[in-house]
Amino acid sequence: MKYRSLTEEIKLLELGLPPQEEDGFIGGNLDPKEASLILIPVPWEATVSFGEGTSKAPDNIRLASHQLDVENYHYIKPYKAGISMLEVDKHILKLSNKTRKKALRVIEAIECGESCKKDLKYVNEVSKTINSHVYEAALKRIKKDKFVAVVGGDHSCPLGLIKALDDTSKEDFGILHVDAHHDLREAYEGFTYSHASIFYNVLNECKNVSKLIQVGIRDYSKEEAQRMVNLGDKGDCLYDTAMQAQIATGKSLEEVFTPYIEQLPKNVYISIDIDGLEPLNCPNTGTPVPGGLRYGELEHLIFMVVKSGRKIIGFDLVEVGDSKNGWDANVGARVLYNLCGALLASQGKIEYR
């Protein structure tokens, strides 16, 4: 890929010309050295437990973003701060496909009341390797004073980034997690780094995470619900049914979301599983669930973090599905650009309104 300088990038994006197919996110090809925000694509989905296809999401989102206009209502010209999406690592995609086949054998064995120890060991070892890869990629950029985000892939993908932030942060930080699921299972289906275990692992491996706020949850196990209760002051959850009930009685989004935003510390990491949205906006995500946030509700929730004065230190977008008409990637690209704007605005890199 031939990179552009930030000056060249801004000039080209403001011309509004159709991007070339090989161009990066929003049609950019910014040299990562000049970017404020680095997007790390992670085409990984070995442990998904229902629908497949999210390993294709990073590239699908890149392509779908080519038809986005770069202006944004809340966030003033995010592209001017410099956003660079790294190229998809084809080796990881190939490894994901290979590991997925072994994971399926493990899942099928469980369903038959059997075990498949050799394949399970392989999946867990490779998953650990992926976590290390993401950790090193993120740490390298963080040490160069870049902001970093992950574009998955399944929800196991951002663990390496969160751990890199945990290891480099001088202060505690909270996590705002939007999802249909708690993702608090311990080694779901035997996979230590399952997509359904991301926040179990985060809470056990990251010492500086002081708060976990979850929004949109509507499909969960007894184990997970109890684990959330056991977090005490360290966690809180706005279940989707409770959220919808408040909205139905006439409460504004500000009234509904504020008690949860106020619990977050000044530094916030945002994790967005696209299935936190209503299925209209993510029909091909791996585990869709009826209900969920409307697109505008998610947009407002994120903006409330920014206008509260909190600083977004990183984020991830995961579980975007694959579809022939490109709708899932289209929505994913818009959520991603919104997250980029929110982080940059919260960090004073751009203005917001």
Please state what every model-predicted region is:
Residues K2-R353:
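Conserved alpha-helical scaffold segments that buttress catalytic/binding sites
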